[in-house]
Amino acid sequence: PDNVKRIAYAASIGMEQIPDCEKMEIKKYLSKYNSISVREKQAEILLKKLQLPIDVRTVLDPTLLLSKEIWNLYALKRLVDEPYMILYSVETKDQNKLITQMAKKIAKVKKLKIVGIYYGGRQQRIEGTDKNFFRVTPSVFLSLFLYADYCIVSSFHGTAFSINFQKNFLTITSGRS
């Protein structure tokens, strides 16, 4: 409906450039918003180039707005009994090979099980994991990070929660921003 307020907080557009063929359509739909904030400066720059009728600002990602103590309130009880490391990757199957190699080496040295958290609806198991969680709820996601002994991640949010929960971690990326 046209008579409702539309607000986007800390949105991410997930691209370096907006394709020319999509600019008009994106502008049409975003112009219906009363307020838009994004979490990447590059996204702010791209959206400002569309000359929207509203101001676009960069704000802090919501994962960084709460303390560890507050996030703990939303986590479930411990879900994995033995000591473990989280393997949370948003990469492709081929890119996961490097991440898996690193995870196996660290898990062996630290004597940890490898617990995989799978991104989105993807159900492809990353080879080398001992236990897997698919389509996790926020409470499960938080619990897995809260109780992990080590984290290997490939995303901003994996890194943010590793820091927030004061975990030893390794972030491996494919060079995306």
Predicted regions and their residues:
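Active-site anion-handling motifs in enzyme catalytic cores
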Residues: 1-177
